[in-house]
């Protein structure tokens, strides 16, 4: 059985899998894998959040592809040129929610694996897929939970490719070898409620929040390094729960997010922020939520194999990057080396999200080339001086 990755992308888009629902997509994918001889485990965690781990042949090394089928809400349906879950192709572009992030990536690596098996590809080892419906939200019941299940079952992955949309301008221009970590702080500053005409009888907490945020924003956390941009902070909310104009509020709440590199740790950042807060006021409450840790997969032979596959299919020399948001690769890095590579991300999460049909076919070809050379490296790969070591002293990363 061979698969057309574009048709599979269309089918996956048709599932209204708004996070963390899969709306049948996980079962559908499992059916495809089973027809090609994969052993499939559909795993439910939390409130019936579905995940899939599919594996072909029980050998080593185990090359895994990972991704998600859940999507963010489509927003106002009237703003879409086509129904977000009714995929349409116009002028070579496939439209639909999840087209970029990341149902085309999932379809491409499924097609690459299944089609190689149909072509009687000979290799020593295993190929597998880890697919979740809880990446955009409730991540504790998605990839993270599957990896814990695998650990308990003594199921090992040796290398993983996450099919997130990493390309910026052209398919093949960017591989992610790491991601910054993300921590969100909530700060509540207390004061004393009162009438605006009698400020001497009140204590306005808004000024405390403003002072603290100014200090945080002007803090140089670090200067970045060879692999990462400097850590930075962005304020996301300020709320006093007050819709009147003559009342000094009794408390003020703010939230801010820090995207941090491998020069920092969540604990170290908490200590720093706490010191800033205490320099302004003693009447505050500070809490922190760490969603995903920073990670870096040191470039190696497998990175070279992906660079070579991209170059062969697209004639583009990809850059290695750690920019952008977080992903489930931050969980996978705890069990094996991981890189991310996929389609162009320009329209991810946007109205009229779309990808090039031609790029879906090219992405599938790149994944196939990578799988073939991962298991059966060409003489070029075997004899190649590590590509990364030759360029790391130059402009390696974006």
UniProtKB/Swiss-Prot annotation:
This protein's UniProt keywords: Amino-acid biosynthesis, Cobalt, Diaminopimelate biosynthesis, Hydrolase, Lysine biosynthesis, Metal-binding, Zinc
Coiled-coil regions listed: none
Binding sites annotated in the UniProt record for Zn(2+) 2: 101, 136, 349
Give the enzyme's EC designation.
3.5.1.18
**Reactions it catalyzes:** N-succinyl-(2S,6S)-2,6-diaminopimelate + H2O = (2S,6S)-2,6-diaminopimelate + succinate
Q: Which cofactor does it need?
A: Zn(2+); Co(2+)
A GO molecular-function descriptor: acetylornithine deacetylase activity
- Read off the Gene3D superfamilies from this record: 3.30.70.360, Zn peptidases (3.40.630.10)
Q: Does the keyword Membrane apply?
A: no
**Single GO biological process annotation from the record:** diaminopimelate biosynthetic process
Instruction: Identify the catalytic residues.
Output: 70, 135 (proton acceptor)
Keyword Zinc applies? yes
Q: What does the entry's cofactor note say about binding and number? A: Binds 2 Zn(2+) or Co(2+) ions per subunit.
Xref: InterPro entries: Bact_exopeptidase_dim_dom, DapE_proteobac, Peptidase_M20, Peptidase_M20_dimer, Peptidase_M20A
Q: In which pathway does it act?
A: Amino-acid biosynthesis; L-lysine biosynthesis via DAP pathway; LL-2,6-diaminopimelate from (S)-tetrahydrodipicolinate (succinylase route): step 3/3
- Sites binding Zn(2+) 1 sit at 68, 101, 164
Enzyme class name: hydrolase
Functional description taken from the UniProt entry? Catalyzes the hydrolysis of N-succinyl-L,L-diaminopimelic acid (SDAP), forming succinate and LL-2,6-diaminopimelate (DAP), an intermediate involved in the bacterial biosynthesis of lysine and meso-diaminopimelic acid, an essential component of bacterial cell walls.
UniProt record similarity statement: Belongs to the peptidase M20A family. DapE subfamily.
Record note on quaternary structure: Homodimer.
State the name under which the record lists this protein.
Answer: Succinyl-diaminopimelate desuccinylase
Q: Which organism is it from?
A: Wolbachia pipientis wMel
Gene name per UniProt: dapE
